[in-house]
Amino acid sequence: MHVTRPKSSKGRSRPMITNSSMIYTPSQPSALSPQPPAAAKTKDKSNQSLRSRAILRRSSQPTTDILTEAYDRPPEEPVSLNRYRVLPSIEKKTSTDNQKCSQCVSRHRKCQHTNARLDVVSDSTPPEESDLLLAIRTPCGQRFKRSFRPSDQLKGVLSAAEAEFGDRFDNCIIETMDVPRRTFSNLTMTLAQCGVLNKSVLCISHDDSEMDLT
């Protein structure tokens, strides 16, 4: 049965569409989704099986090149886990410390022995007498300086004054200028016995007691 289609605006008739063309048959393959042939699939499967077999053979049986490379390789040096220098043992350090201590003790004993010898020598020798610088004043008021020893007597001081000025000092005594003043009529006494110190002043005076008796 043919159905007439109305004409378009331009006067042309539209094509006829049958009902048979509108029916969808799932058994027919679609032109938009092409399927690969079956022969190509079987070929890919065979290639994959051959590759897997070759990989298994290589992994199970190592080649001679790999073995020779492993034997020819030089041995690796052991890696030290300690970055710091190894310290000496405690026993060695203790022995060296003991040696140093013994050396110090021996040196100290030698020094003590030497000092003891020096002390004995200094004690055996008599100490040198230091000179006394004295200022002497005559009865006339004249002065002079002279060095004497502590073991010198007072009459030696009187003789030095007579030699210095060329006069005779008979019936004289010697006095000190210290406070209180001390008078010595016994001219045989030494300066040490009189307690005369360094840089002292001694005065030669006439003995007034003898002058009164005359």
UniProtKB/Swiss-Prot annotation:
Q: Which residues cross the membrane?
A: none
Residue ranges occupied by any UBX domain in the UniProt entry: 127-204
Pfam families linked: UBX
GO MF annotations in UniProt: ubiquitin binding
Keyword terms = Cell projection, Cilium, Cilium biogenesis/degradation
Q: Where is the composition biased (Polar residues)?
A: 16-25
Tell me the compartments it is located in.
Cell projection, Cilium
**What's any one GO cellular component for it?**
cilium
The UniProt annotation puts the region (Disordered) at 1-79
The protein's predominant localisation is other
User: Basic residues: which segments have biased composition?
Assistant: 1-13
Is Transport given among the entry's keywords? no
Cite the PROSITE patterns for this sequence: UBX
Q: Which residues form the signal peptide?
A: none
A biological process from GO? ERAD pathway
Gene3D superfamilies according to UniProt: Phosphatidylinositol 3-kinase Catalytic Subunit, Chain A, domain 1 (3.10.20.90)
> Which intervals carry biased composition (Low complexity)?
49-60
Reported consequences of knocking out the gene: Defects in left-right asymmetry during embryogenesis, due to defects in ciliogenesis.
Record family assignment: Belongs to the UBXN10 family.
Q: What does this protein do?
A: Required for ciliogenesis. Acts as a tethering factor that facilitates recruitment of vcp/p97 to the intraflagellar transport complex B (IFT-B) in cilia.
Supply the name of the protein.
UBX domain-containing protein 10
